[in-house]
């Protein structure tokens, strides 16, 4: 008998709990979804581009056409090679290939202002109004590159110079 009374009391107590409004339930659901998504999102892939050597330029058949970007002294080796049909950067000793984005703007020497790679996207801002004549037919263009991971998070930004020709 005592058990029946306890069960009846528990049943009555559970009936007296207020139901959540639709707005409260939606807010709780959105919060739970955001918590799950935050737990599944990996941290950004922090990268530091390395200089591309003359041997790598030869191995990947990168011509002198297009632009070679470097933070300082592009003559010593570029951190990005940007051409009409391809772009390359080097991370952790491995070359990453980029394809020009067909919908992007045009840069100097037939380059693009956006390139897409397997792991990263590259946004290139050429300051062509500040371009200066360099050796031969080359032009020195102040440039900013922004590297993004696959989730469009910025993982690297640098100001430097592009030698274009």
Question: Language-model features: where?
Answer:
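Short, low-complexity, Pro/Ser/Thr/Gly-rich segments in the mature regions of secreted, periplasmic
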Residues: 154-165
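Short, surface-exposed coil-to-beta transition loops
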Residues: 84, 139-143, 157
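Bacterial signal peptide processing site
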Residues: 15-18
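Short, isolated positions in well-ordered beta-strands
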Residues: 96-98, 121-122, 155
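Sec-dependent bacterial lipoprotein signal peptides
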Residues: 1-13
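Acidic, glycine-rich flexible loop segments
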Residues: 108-151
């Amino acid at each position: 008998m005592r058990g029946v009374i306890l069960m009846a009391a528990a049943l009555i107590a559970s009936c007296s709990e207020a139901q959540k409004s639709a707005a409260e339930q939606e807010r709780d659901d959105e919060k739970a979804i955001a918590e799950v998504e935050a737990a599944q999102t990996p941290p950004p892939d922090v990268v530091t581009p390395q200089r591309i050597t003359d041997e790598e330029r030869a191995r990947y058949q990168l011509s002198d056409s297009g632009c070679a970007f470097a933070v300082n002294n592009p003559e010593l080796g570029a951190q990005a090679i940007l051409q009409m049909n391809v772009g390359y950067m080097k991370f952790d000793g491995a070359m990453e290939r980029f394809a020009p984005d067909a919908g992007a703007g045009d840069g100097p020497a037939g380059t693009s202002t956006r390139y897409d790679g397997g792991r990263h996207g590259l946004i290139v801002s050429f300051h062509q109004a500040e371009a200066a004549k360099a050796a031969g037919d080359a032009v020195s263009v102040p440039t900013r590159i922004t590297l993004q991971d696959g989730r469009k998070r910025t993982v690297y930004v640098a100001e430097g110079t592009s030698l274009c020709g």
